[in-house]
Amino acid sequence: MNYQETTEYLFNSTPVFEHIGASAYKEGLDNTYALDEYFGHPHTNFRSIHIAGTNGKGSCSHTLAAILQADGYKVGLYTSPHLVDFRERIRVNGEMVPEQYVIDFVEEHKDFFEPLHPSFFELT
């Protein structure tokens, strides 16, 4: 797959809230737990800050990421939605992940994803 085919796969093989509304919602955390287990509980391998709330999450997240990066930390930032390119959601030290990273990730793990039928939110 090339990058365009990969992002089309992500959008078309999973329920996307922005496209179909509330029917994309999946009750429960079973898929989240299964994905967490599959990836070896990656959140336990680094310090993280989760920013939540109604308004201002994006600007707060980007500001905090810039402050931490300026102080010498390696900073990963996940935000949504994206405006143009899916990779806008996933940045490391302010740079979008490479297209090839997204392609390789999906190709390497899609055999696990497909029978799970995760939502777009759960998968990304």
Feature map (PLM): residue ranges:
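Short functional linear segments
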Residues: 1-53, 60-62, 66-71
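ATP-dependent carboxylate-amine ligase catalytic core
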Residues: 22-29, 34-37, 41-44, 70-124
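Short active-site-adjacent helix-start/loop capping segments
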Residues: 57-61, 84-87
